[in-house]
Amino acid sequence: MEWAEKYRPEHLADIVGNTSAVRQMADWAKTWTARSKPLLLYGKPGIGKTSSVYALARDMNWDVIELNASDQRTAAVIERIAGAGSTTASLTGSARKLIIMDEADNLQGTADRGGAKAILECIKNARQPIVLIANDLYGLAAELRLRCEPVQFRALPARSIAPRLKYICSSEKIACSESAVHEIAESAEGDMRSAVNMLYASAIGRQSLDGKNVHTSQKDERVSIFSLVTAVFGKTSDEELIRLSRDVDEFPEDIEQWVEGSVHTITDPAGLGLAYRSLSRADEYIGYTYRRQYHTLWRYATAVMLLGVADASAGKGIHSRILPPERWQKMSVAKKQKAIRAAVLSRLAATMQLPQATLREKYMDIITLLVDLDPETFARELALDADGLNFFLNDKSRAQEILKSLAKVEREKEPEPKKKGRKKAESPAKDADPAPAVDPVPKEELPVKSAPEERPADPPAPEEPGRKTVAHNQSTLFDGF
């Protein structure tokens, strides 16, 4: 058995790194109700997402149903497997079944036709916990992201990977030097699975391992935009900047906006002016590219913006978080609000049997006032999540508190296990005191009661001709009229 599988973590406590993500998963599982959002785990491959989900299921004693990229994930398959599993109880005695949809951002081609829509329907109707796993958060449809609770898994630092490698070497009785462990941990680039596989490949047939025997392999990965922006403002050579720009999977106009978002960190006025002139010149090249369809100009645009801003920053580095361009953030917020509004209007229209246009134009102000007066009832009847309730209340903290109280009430209503109920039913019979013995009364002393005289029944009243007898068993306000 390969070591990556042999030493896969069995419990959440065994997961290396990502402490906040693991804690978020545990809290979600302990407080899960039918109203809870599915979890969406995202992050680069090999950092423990799938292992964490299986460890969670083992800790909670939940059965598991998994669909991954190796399966056909058409609408029919998802409905038959995950859809049925999400609404039915477990046959093994487990309290719940955990539905795992791995590589949810990789629904492509005819083999996965209709899969994204089927996942949405499965989430809407689910009565069992669901976890989606993705490498790229934005590879999922926006509506799917909004219906899930995101949990980010980050790449592991080498100092977190090294102790796990030492533990494996100790378990396999292999003497491994510090240099070998350090080299493997650094080469893995945050990927625990890759580190364990490299250790396994290096240790085959050996009783000891040092730096000379280590077989490392660099994974063929694209450079992230964050690495490129950091390099632009750091002490990076021109050749290295051009190489990094070729390995980034972004268009030049997108790179330009990312770099522009961090230009404000340049404090020297002269340097700031040079940076903006470089970006302006690069923008002209990008415009020429689209107007003339001459894409060779892209290379000039990239070189001008990167080398110009790097020269302006003078290698002083960037000392703040690298954030997406502000325009993108505003567009993302607007898109999210639009999706929430559309979902709320759709539910209201279906409940009230009115067209969405009529609701939006005539009744939204009144409904908003009613929701503010009794948010619990509306949240329960319309199955609103935090975003949907906040759409009416415009108070996110209040919306979350209301949903927490509703979830607590639902958990209290859940039936207890049958064994406890049976014990409670049997306990009164065991604890009850026996009835006191009563001396029987002799038959001679028992008083004899005479049967009451039967009175002849009154003759029925004669019915009027042409009139039927009506029963006066009124069950509603309008009976008898």
UniProtKB/Swiss-Prot annotation:
Q: How does it assemble?
A: Heteromultimer composed of small subunits (RfcS) and large subunits (RfcL).
Q: Which Gene3D superfamilies match?
A: 1.10.8.60, P-loop containing nucleotide triphosphate hydrolases
Ranges of compositional bias, category Basic and acidic residues: 408-433, 441-457
Q: What is this protein called?
A: Replication factor C large subunit
Q: What does this protein do?
A: Part of the RFC clamp loader complex which loads the PCNA sliding clamp onto DNA.
What ranges does the record give for the region Disordered, renumbered to this chain?
Answer: 408-481
What Gene Ontology terms describe what this protein does at the molecular function level? ATP binding; ATP hydrolysis activity; DNA clamp loader activity
Q: Name one GO biological process term.
A: DNA replication
Q: Which UniProt keywords apply?
A: ATP-binding, DNA replication, Nucleotide-binding
Its family remark reads: Belongs to the activator 1 small subunits family. RfcL subfamily.
Q: Which gene encodes it?
A: rfcL
Ranges of compositional bias, category Polar residues = 471-481
> PANTHER family, per this entry?
CHROMOSOME TRANSMISSION FIDELITY FACTOR 18 (PTHR23389), REPLICATION FACTOR C SUBUNIT 1 (PTHR23389:SF6)
InterPro entries recorded: AAA+_ATPase, ATPase_AAA_core, P-loop_NTPase, Rep_factor-C_lsu, RFC_lid
